Curated annotation (Swiss-Prot):
GO MF annotations, alphabetized: proton-transporting ATP synthase activity, rotational mechanism; proton-transporting ATPase activity, rotational mechanism
Quaternary structure annotation from Swiss-Prot or TrEMBL: F-type ATPases have 2 components, F(1) - the catalytic core - and F(0) - the membrane proton channel. F(1) has five subunits: alpha(3), beta(3), gamma(1), delta(1), epsilon(1). F(0) has three main subunits: a(1), b(2) and c(10-14). The alpha and beta chains form an alternating ring which encloses part of the gamma chain. F(1) is attached to F(0) by a central stalk formed by the gamma and epsilon chains, while a peripheral stalk is formed by the delta and b chains.
CDD domains given in the database record: ATP-synt_Fo_b (cd06503)
The protein's name in its UniProt record: ATP synthase subunit b
Pfam families per UniProt: ATP-synt_B
């Protein structure tokens, strides 16, 4: 029996090996090119994807670099605009202060002229009133023959009337 088992086992091995070689030959003859084509296509696709990813990464780096340069340029421009606005503001501030100073000086001079004019007019008015009072006082003194005390009292009463008016 052992011989039978050994021969069956040997037969099974031979049939199995024959089947494997036949299957290998058939695959090699009919499907091997397609199978290797799939692997080659897959390899090419992976290589293309890697190249595309590398190109996309390089383009992204270039884009990042460009955006950083644009941002730096925008910051520089913003700084220049702010500096120009500050300069313009200081110039306008100085101009407004100078104009206000000139206006205040002009108003002060006009006020001084108005005061001087009012002073002259008031002085002329006082002179006229003093002259009128002097004439009036002289008339009254001439109408009355008064001694020194009566003249002094008369002058004082007219001055009091002048103070009340």
């Amino acid at each position: 029996m052992s011989l039978l088992i050994n021969s069956t086992t040997l037969g099974n091995i031979i049939i199995t090996l024959g089947s494997v070689f036949l299957l290998y030959y058939l695959i090699r003859k009919f499907a091997w090119d397609q199978i290797t084509g799939i692997f080659v296509a897959r390899e090419k696709k992976i290589a293309t994807d890697i190249d595309s990813a590398e190109n996309a990464r390089q383009e992204a780096e270039i884009l990042v670099q460009k955006r950083q340069e644009e941002l730096a340029a925008a910051r520089t421009e913003a700084t220049q605009i702010i500096d120009e606005a500050k300069k313009t503001g200081k110039t306008k501030e100085s101009k407004i202060i100078a104009e206000a100073y000139d206006e205040a000086k002009r108003l002060k001079e006009k006020a001084n002229q108005d005061i001087a004019q009012s002073w002259v007019e008031a002085l002329a008015g006082v002179k006229g009133e003093v002259a009128d009072l002097t004439v009036l006082l002289a008339e009254k003194v001439m109408k009355q023959n008064l001694d020194a005390k009566a003249q002094s009292d008369l002058i004082d009463s007219y001055l009091d009337q002048l103070g009340d008016a």
